[in-house]
Design a protein with these regions (language model features):
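Long, charge-rich, low-complexity alpha-helical segments
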Residues: 32-98
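Acidic, low-complexity/disordered tracts enriched in E/D and polar residues
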Residues: 1-45, 91, 95-96
């Protein structure tokens, strides 16, 4: 993991709501709806501006009893998609010695 990744943390964007839609769970903003599966929803909920991506990977592995080598690329891809779609923003990650 690069120094830049360690210093940036994903945080949910404001104005996004979680709703149950006809086809499953949705992340709903002012202009768009994003259908998400259980794993993506769990990941989005971890985007609190305090949790590092590597900690998210560990949490998803534990929650879904899945191996890290399978989870890590998926988590990074979903975080990139969330950022591209405006569902999260990357914030400064100076958390001290947490």
């Amino acid at each position: 993991m690069s120094t830049a990744e360690v210093s940036r943390l994903p945080r949910r964007s404001g104005g996004i709501e979680v709703r149950r839609g006809d086809d499953g769970m949705e992340l709903v903003g002012s202009h768009e709806r994003h259908l998400v599966n259980e794993t993506a929803l769990a990941l989005w909920q971890l985007c609190d501006g305090q949790t590092r991506p590597d900690e998210m990977i560990d949490a998803i592995c534990a929650l879904f009893d899945a191996p890290q080598e399978r989870v890590e690329p998926d988590v990074r891809q979903v975080l990139d998609a969330f950022a591209r779609d405006g569902l999260i923003e990357w914030v400064s990650g100076d958390r001290g010695d947490r």
